[in-house]
């Protein structure tokens, strides 16, 4: 939860002093924390009962001060930080213990795929001469495929990508009912380890698990997902430390309302903060993010005619995704702009994009690539999508494709003009 001013002003000031000290100590942004507790008390000496800094003389006698127990996001440790009543001195009593459940996850395996410069890629239906030429024009370095666990065709996808000079990202997502099968997490981890061993450059662990079309209804649970992520991460790194492990990207949504949770879906920000609280940051190289509902330039952070909900805008979507993951980069595993041009009217659920032109799609994708690269906060941007031709009354995915009806690809030119 966000730590906000729900206590008296002096206690809040003292908390900010303690939080600032701890932020510097562990080199983490503590705007959001998993939990914090406080108490105003009399302590037995001038160091408030903590070990004093070297060279400081401790004076015995009752001394008033504040004790704060703070657990950062993604960190099982609960830190005991104390502040004198006059707010002038901070004393560090070390770690007060770990949060319940903090020891249930395995220690993360070593890996070297985190960090790196910004790169561009595209999600393809088929890797053929047409898509290869389009992606090369766009200066894409990655190709993405989404597969089911156990799919033997994945090894052919890896070989084809390598043969054509691309890195490959495999998004591995099962069915909701798979989650309930005993031993499935171990099976999943074994399969993604095989993919890593076969040369997969990146693996996204599941997809949109905040929706019941991807996770069982009534059982959406970020902590349970982190159990899967931890098993997958360690299995992948044991086979190929260089494989980029990306957490599954939740679907951007605010449909669950102020509480953020229903049996069928959770708001993405609530889901991701609880992922962070469950320790997800230890088991990912990159935070998976989707952004696919924009109808204005990604350079804008206001002015959407629908409303100002954060998922409408590129910048606020990025901030929302990384709020609980200080020091981590984002990987946009789906970033696209929907245009009906060349297809006709969009189905009702997508009518919000009816006025987006192909020229705007091309311009905005290039702008998003520039913003991502310049931010330093984005490792990878996968365009959704390159070549899907399907356009139905329920899913107009062809409208997201950068290869348009007739074969032209205006976005290939705009992306190629901004990518090195």
Task: List PLM regions with ranges.
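Short, non-transmembrane alpha-helical segments in secretory-pathway proteins
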Residues: 4-48
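A short, surface-exposed interaction/processing loop segment used at functional sites
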Residues: 76-102
């Amino acid at each position: 939860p966000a730590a906000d001013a729900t206590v008296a002003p002096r206690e809040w000031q003292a908390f900010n002093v303690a939080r600032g000290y701890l932020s510097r100590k562990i080199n983490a942004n503590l705007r959001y924390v998993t939990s914090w507790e406080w108490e105003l008390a009399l302590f037995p000496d001038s160091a408030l009962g903590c070990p004093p800094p070297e060279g400081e003389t401790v004076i015995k006698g009752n001394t008033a001060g504040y004790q704060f127990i703070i657990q950062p996001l993604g960190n099982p440790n609960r830190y005991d930080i104390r502040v004198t009543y006059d707010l002038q001195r901070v004393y560090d009593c070390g770690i007060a213990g770990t949060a319940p459940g903090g020891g249930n996850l395995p220690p993360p395996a070593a890996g070297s795929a985190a960090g790196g410069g910004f790169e561009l890629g595209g999600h393809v239906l088929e890797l053929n001469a047409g898509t290869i030429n389009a992606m090369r024009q766009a200066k894409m370095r990655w190709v993405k495929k989404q597969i089911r666990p156990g799919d033997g065709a994945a090894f052919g996808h890896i070989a084809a990508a390598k043969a054509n000079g691309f890195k490959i990202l495999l998004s591995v997502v099962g069915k909701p009912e798979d989650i309930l099968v005993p031993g499935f997490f171990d099976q999943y981890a074994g399969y993604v380890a095989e993919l890593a061993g076969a040369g997969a450059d990146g693996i996204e662990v599941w997809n949109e698990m905040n929706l019941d079309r991807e996770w069982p209804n009534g059982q959406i649970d970020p902590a349970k997902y982190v159990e899967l992520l931890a098993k997958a991460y360690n299995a992948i790194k044991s086979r190929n430390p260089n494989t980029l492990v990306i957490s599954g990207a939740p679907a951007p949504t605010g449909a669950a309302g102020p509480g953020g949770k229903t049996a069928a879906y959770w708001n993405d920000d609530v889901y991701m903060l609880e992922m962070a609280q469950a320790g997800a940051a230890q088991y990912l190289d990159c935070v998976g993010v989707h952004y696919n509902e924009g109808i204005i330039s990604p350079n804008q952070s206001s002015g959407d005619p629908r409303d100002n909900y954060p998922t409408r805008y590129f910048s606020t979507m990025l901030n929302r995704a990384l709020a609980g993951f200080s020091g981590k980069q984002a990987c946009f595993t789906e970033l696209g702009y929907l245009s009906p041009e060349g297809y006709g009217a969009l189905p009702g659920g997508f009518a919000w994009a009816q006025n987006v032109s192909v020229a705007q799609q091309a311009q905005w994708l290039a702008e998003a690539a520039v913003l991502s690269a310049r931010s330093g906060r984005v490792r990878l941007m996968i365009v959704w999508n390159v070549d899907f031709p399907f356009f139905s009354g329920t899913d107009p995915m062809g409208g997201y494709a950068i290869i348009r009806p007739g074969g032209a690809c205006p976005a290939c030119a705009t992306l190629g003009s901004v990518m090195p």
